[in-house]
Curated annotation (Swiss-Prot):
Glycosylation sites: N26, N27, N39, N142, N170, N181, N302, N497
Other observations noted: Major glycoprotein, comprises over 80% of the envelope proteins present in virus particle. The extent of infection into host organism is determined by HA. Influenza viruses bud from the apical surface of polarized epithelial cells (e.g. bronchial epithelial cells) into lumen of lungs and are therefore usually pneumotropic. The reason is that HA is cleaved by tryptase clara which is restricted to lungs. However, HAs of H5 and H7 pantropic avian viruses subtypes can be cleaved by furin and subtilisin-type enzymes, allowing the virus to grow in other organs than lungs.
Protein name: Hemagglutinin
Cellular localization per UniProt: Virion membrane; Host apical cell membrane
One Gene Ontology MF term: host cell surface receptor binding
Keyword tags: Clathrin- and caveolin-independent endocytosis of virus by host, Clathrin-mediated endocytosis of virus by host, Disulfide bond, Fusion of virus membrane with host endosomal membrane, Fusion of virus membrane with host membrane, Glycoprotein, Hemagglutinin, Host cell membrane, Host membrane, Host-virus interaction, Lipoprotein, Membrane, Palmitate, Signal, Transmembrane, Transmembrane helix, Viral attachment to host cell, Viral envelope protein, Viral penetration into host cytoplasm, Virion, Virus endocytosis by host, Virus entry into host cell
Organism: Influenza A virus (strain A/Turkey/Ontario/7732/1966 H5N9)
Name of the encoding gene: HA
Length: 565
């Protein structure tokens, strides 16, 4: 009877005072990826991939863009009559051109080295138009009749505003010899052209002379062009073509023109007033009366994040473009009810804590205690502050390293450079793939480190308590310790702050531990006796049942019994 009572006493042992080490939990549903796992729910995380834009064209650092609307760069610089609103433009931050502007070269033809000209304009922020050869200075040539129905204005034939189409006057076209000296302190952009008639009749009707040329020379340029008379299909009602050229005239340099026909002379030129970081962006958007540091063709980005996936082409101080759809850095610990027992990639031991505590709100790591005075949570603020500072510095370092001024603008190639253009696109795609891979790998590795860092911090707290308590408490295996002595709130606080007095409680703990161990040993003997008794009794009952069954079967003939001697 006494042994049974002891056994029942062991079963009903009351739990002692306990202290547990754990981590903060909340209602967060934020998920991150690591090298080892995907979609790990964490208490706190920081998105470093910008996905949003405002859908507008904005000023860049307070300077408005030059939005050409339906005009092309060529139509603007030559002075297409439909582009009069751009005859004089203020400083711009970048130039916006539609994919297929309708007002370009109204008189059909070509613009020599047009892609290079656009590249020049993409590194310019302001030009100023000046007159270099007045229209009324062509006294021996007709400077007013050179118009075309292909360049209409108010229902009448017109021509480009910034050049003069010179034709014969009084049935004569004297040889032109003109020189202009650039006395400005700025470089000068000069444009001119040559007309290619459709037939010989048009040639003599316009210029009198049949064998004509246009010669242009500077200190670096020596060009002589001959009109090409040929039958061509009509474009904008014209069989003829005009080919335009351009050059940059340095300060104190001169440009000389000589021609006896077919000359499209410059009236205005452009001073390159300000060079800088500009670009030509293709977009159909309109100005949105806003300001930004980063502009894309689909809208402005206002973000401090180091990466974005809005559009590969950008202007300004922009995050780096990557092809990723998700880049999230973990900052807080895991936020799951159960943590699988595992070892992290970087060596931190995880899994001895069963779950997080939503009741602990003032720290990432801490304690939960229970004793006769009650129970409660207490954050370990020192380890929490160190962790917050470390992770914040790491995140800021990643952002600072990646969030540098970065521009990616489109490049112009002519029809003869398609293979170069394709190669350029392949190279850019390759760079984007590398950036994307590096960004994703960086995030995966840092998230793995962060989660292991949190696990390590909790483990350090656990070890701190274990080293203090030693054999004054029992490890329960779930992040908790059960004391072998009474531990009031003052005692609990001493464990938390590292001042626990082990000798003070060691004698009480030893006595309680020995008493519990003795009860365990006595109960073990009781269990052995009960086990033997149970085994013998069950064996005897089984033998009686088998004998009775055999006797019954023999009596009714179901079983024959033979005894052989």
């Amino acid at each position: 009877m006494e042994r049974i009572v002891i056994a029942l006493a062991i079963i009903s042992v009351v739990k002692g005072d306990q202290i547990c080490i754990g981590y903060h939990a909340n209602n967060s549903t934020k998920q991150v990826d690591t090298i080892m796992e995907k979609n790990v729910t964490v208490t706190y995380a920081q998105d470093i991939l910008e996905k949003e834009h405002n859908g507008k064209l904005c000023s860049l650092k307070g300077v408005r863009p030059l939005i050409l609307k339906d005009c092309s760069v060529a139509g603007w610089l030559l002075g297409n009559p439909m582009c009069d609103e751009f005859l004089n433009v203020p400083e711009w931050s970048y130039i916006v051109e539609k994919d297929n502007p309708t007002n370009g070269l109204c008189y059909p033809g070509d613009f020599n080295d047009y892609e290079e000209l656009k590249h020049l304009m993409s590194s310019t922020n302001h030009i100023e138009k000046i007159r270099i050869i007045p229209r009324n200075s062509w006294s021996e040539h007709n400077a007013s009749s050179g118009v075309s129905s292909s360049c209409p204005y108010n229902g009448r034939s017109s021509f480009y505003r910034n050049v003069v189409w010179l034709i014969k006057k009084n049935n004569s076209y004297p040889t032109i010899k003109r020189t202009y000296n650039n006395t400005n302190v700025e470089d000068l952009l000069i444009l001119w052209g040559i007309h290619h008639p459709a037939d010989a009749a048009e040639q003599t009707r316009l210029y009198k002379n049949s064998n004509t040329y246009v010669s242009v020379g500077t200190s670096t340029l020596n060009q002589r062009s001959i009109p090409e008379i040929a039958t061509r299909p009509k474009v904008n009602g014209q069989n003829g073509r005009i080919e335009f050229f351009w050059t940059i005239l340095r300060p104190n340099h001169a440009i000389s023109f000589e021609s006896n026909g077919n000359f499209i002379a410059p009236e205005y030129a452009y001073k390159i007033v300000k060079k800088g970081d500009s670009a030509i962006m293709r977009s159909e958007l309109e100005y949105g009366n806003c300001d930004t540091k980063c502009q894309t063709p689909v809208g402005a980005i206002n973000s401090s994040m180091p990466f974005h996936n809005v559009h590969p082409l950008t202007i300004g101080e922009c995050p780096k473009y990557v092809k990723s759809n998700k880049l999230v850095l973990a900052t807080g610990p895991r936020n799951v009810p159960q943590r699988r027992k595992k070892r992290g990639l970087f060596g931190a031991k995880a899994g001895f804590i069963e779950g997080g505590w939503q009741g602990m709100v003032d720290g990432w790591y801490g304690y939960h205690h229970s004793n006769e005075q009650g129970s409660g949570y207490a954050a370990d603020k020192e380890s929490t502050h160190k962790a917050i500072d470390g992770i914040t510095n790491k995140v800021n370092s990643i952002i600072d390293k990646m969030n540098t001024q970065f521009e990616a603008v489109g490049k112009e190639f002519n029809n003869l450079e398609r293979r170069i253009e394709n190669l350029n696109k392949q190279m850019e795609d390759g760079f984007l793939d590398v950036w994307t891979y590096n960004a994703e790998l960086l995030v995966l590795m840092e998230n793995e480190r962060t989660l292991d860092f949190h696990d390590s911090n909790v483990k350090n707290l656990y070890d701190k308590v274990r080293l203090q308590l030693r054999d004054n408490a029992k490890e329960l295996g779930n992040g908790c310790f059960e004391f072998y002595h009474k531990c009031d709130n003052e005692c609990m606080e001493s464990v938390r702050n590292g001042t626990y007095d082990y000798p003070q409680y060691s004698e009480e703990s030893r006595l309680n531990r020995e008493e519990i161990d003795g009860v365990k040993l006595e109960s073990m003997g009781t269990y052995q006796i009960l086990s033997i008794y149970s085994t013998v009794a069950s064996s005897l009952a089984l033998a009686i049942m088998v004998a009775g069954l055999s006797f019954w079967m023999c009596s009714n003939g179901s079983l024959q019994c033979r005894i052989c001697i």
